[in-house]
Amino acid sequence: GAYMFYAQKNTDNTYMLSVNGACHATAFNQHSDRDLKDNIQVIDNATDRIRKMNGYTYTLKENGMPYAGVIAQEALEAIPEVVGSAMKYQDGASGSEGEEGERYYTVDYSGVTGLLVQVARESDD
């Protein structure tokens, strides 16, 4: 049968939780404290960057359900810092190191929010 969720340790020593379906919570919080960050820079040319992306509605192939969002390949051109990748394994896979899977792009939408904030700031100028 299909998995409900799995966790894996990535080769860069980060961890990923994959959920087959929707996740519901009151909040999903990311670390954002200035004290945790180095090399802080305002996003330059935010308006030009956002114009490299479109907002889309689409149907997800794996479940046929409608969604809205961005395309990772466009985000990669606009602001590569928000694009990552993950592995998708076949049903029944153990996720063991070296096991075959399909790599696909992911988008950190909170990073896209940072870009949108800066677009609004640029429109004030």
Please place each PLM-identified region on the residue numbering.
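Long, leucine- and charge-enriched amphipathic alpha-helices
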Residues: 102-125
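Structural detector of coil-to-beta-strand junctions
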Residues: 1-4, 14-16
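C-terminal intramolecular chaperone/autoprocessing and neck/assembly modules of extracellular spikes
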Residues: 9, 13-109
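Ordered hydrophobic segments in well-structured contexts
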Residues: 4-6, 117
